[in-house]
Amino acid sequence: MSRDKQQAEQVALDVVDAVLGGAVLKDVQGISDEHMSSLYAFAFQFYEQGRLDDAEKFFHFLCIYDFNNSHYWMGLAAVHQLKQNHQKAIDLYAIAFAQGNNDYRPMLYTGQCHLALGKVGKARLCFEYVLDQATQDDLREQARVYLDTLGHIEQDCSED
């Protein structure tokens, strides 16, 4: 085996060991927080412009290089929600929710995705959870509106 190939394999093994040890690729590769913030700004700008394929690529990169940042997962999930990939969005929101400290937005958006998939019971559970657990008034109000609307729809259906 050539010396260059041995060095390349050793670098690859070192990267794998670092990642398995809990390091994120941005740190292993020496990518600064400022650079990651700039990439996030591009991703968000693409998202706002409706350039969802471009936004998806950037958010995907960000998630790979810093899998501990819930904002990156939220961005990627939001892209999939807008692209009507609701189940994928639900899965990604679950990661964002697990990593976000008392951030109940992913749970609210998961409820929206369940509604889009016609899973009213699961959506209701998400909205009830947000209403019970969230401390942000605006988030609680959004959950309450969804629950009230679902209640009115169910009442109208039972009267028919």
Stretches with model-predicted labels:
Residues M1-H35:
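Long, contiguous interaction/recruitment modules in multidomain scaffold/adaptor proteins
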